[in-house]
């Protein structure tokens, strides 16, 4: 399967807003267990990384394929989804976890909306 960052962001929004599957399944997917290997205070639900951010709770998933890193994240308090793909399969090759870039980008977008 080939996908673009735009496809992933659209998918994340549909998925985490309950439009991809019956909405009654979402509480099961979003009830996570502690997953410290994914970040401080992170939890892992059914295929969902649940983590606190400065923008509130974020839902998402990351992945890699040799030569690529991918991250998608959805901020339910703001109803925005973002995705990032990087040409590297070394997790720290970009200096920090990819989700950090997405949180920062979301903050910039939201600040622009307030102006």
Give the role of each language-model region.
Residues 1-115:
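Catalytic loop of the DD-peptidase/beta-lactamase superfamily, centered on the K-T-G motif
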């Amino acid at each position: 399967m080939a996908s673009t960052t735009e496809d992933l962001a659209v998918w994340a929004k549909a998925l985490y807003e309950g439009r991809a599957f019956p909405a009654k399944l979402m509480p099961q997917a979003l009830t996570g267990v502690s997953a410290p290997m994914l970040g401080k205070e992170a939890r892992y639900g059914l295929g969902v990384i649940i983590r606190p951010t400065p923008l509130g709770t974020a839902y998402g998933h990351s992945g890699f394929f040799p030569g690529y890193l991918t991250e998608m994240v959805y901020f339910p308090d703001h109803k925005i989804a973002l995705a990032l793909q990087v040409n590297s399969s070394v997790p720290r090759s970009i200096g920090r976890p990819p989700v950090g870039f997405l949180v920062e980008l979301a903050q910039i977008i939201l600040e622009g909306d307030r102006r």
